[in-house]
Amino acid sequence: MQNSSLLKPPSIKAQHKIAKRRAVRRRRIDLNCGCSIFLHINCADNGFTHRGEHHCSSGREFRFYLGGSKSPIFQDTTRRGPVVHQNQDLPHPSPVQPQPTESIGSPQSLLQLPSLDDFDESFWADIFK
């Protein structure tokens, strides 16, 4: 009978090797805004919202490759309905983010400080002696 302290735990390398064998199958979708998303194959017919537009990830859009992996050809099957919906509840995106207006007064977190011009000459003479 072997001592249990001499036994080594099973190596995690074997589990990693098995996990790396099978590549995650996903599909790339290029959106009109220039962004690209990758959808897992098992996530078919689910939707998502991106920049205020709702996208439906149905089987309408898919990419298949001829020749090398760098030569995509987009294939469109017949549409069942609209794929992109405008969400009225979300604000429409703007390429320029508005900046808050600057206030003239002092910030609320700081007390109102007196102007340095309000101090008389004797005050400055005492400081710089």
From Swiss-Prot:
Effect of mutating residue 109 to G: Favorises an early viral DNA accumulation during infection in Arabidopsis
Residue(s) carrying Phosphoserine: 109
PTMs per UniProt: Phosphorylated at Ser-109 by A.thaliana KIN10.
GO molecular function (one): DNA binding
GO process annotations (BP): symbiont-mediated suppression of host innate immune response
InterPro entries recorded: Gemini_AL2 (IPR000942)
Protein name: Transcriptional activator protein
Species per Swiss-Prot/TrEMBL record: Cabbage leaf curl virus (isolate Jamaica)
